[in-house]
């Protein structure tokens, strides 16, 4: 994922319609990670307006809520099992040279050029975290990843919670 990002100048990330904690957390987690570690990349996040409960996340005010008619080198979709979940931003997906999907839904139909799908994972944030260099994750990224994990595990109550889920959440808590 990071090799693909480094080779891209215009880079777009997006989650699903009616964004929940995992969607917002994964899109902003990747956004903050790339801004910190690949500052030469132009990164844009497109989402429908998230709930105000996520206003504490770094990058929340940088989200664009309407599609732009422009070309993207790379388009990353997070927490989406199918293309119909990326409306109203389908044109952005179609205008990209390369597409990547990072997801955890068993129903994912592998619609992107490259698909990182782990149905055994609790959340897209958990899958996304496994693509990161742990030493390059900062507090802003950690808050986003933790938010997504908390939301999709019901604060660790749901059966999707695993030891790996808890280990990652613990690492994120240690960062602040």
Residue ranges of predicted features:
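Single conserved hydrophobic/aromatic residue that forms the stacking wall/gate
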Residues: 1-7, 11
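Short, glycine/acidic-enriched loop or turn micro-motifs at the edges of active sites
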Residues: 19, 23, 80-82, 106, ...
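Anionic-ligand anchoring segments at beta-strand to alpha-helix junctions in alpha/beta enzyme folds, i.e.
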Residues: 12-70
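Active-site cofactor/cluster-binding pocket
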Residues: 58-114
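A structured phosphate/pyrophosphate-recognition subdomain
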Residues: 29-36, 109-176
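Generic beta-sheet signal
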Residues: 46-48, 78, 102-104, 119, ...
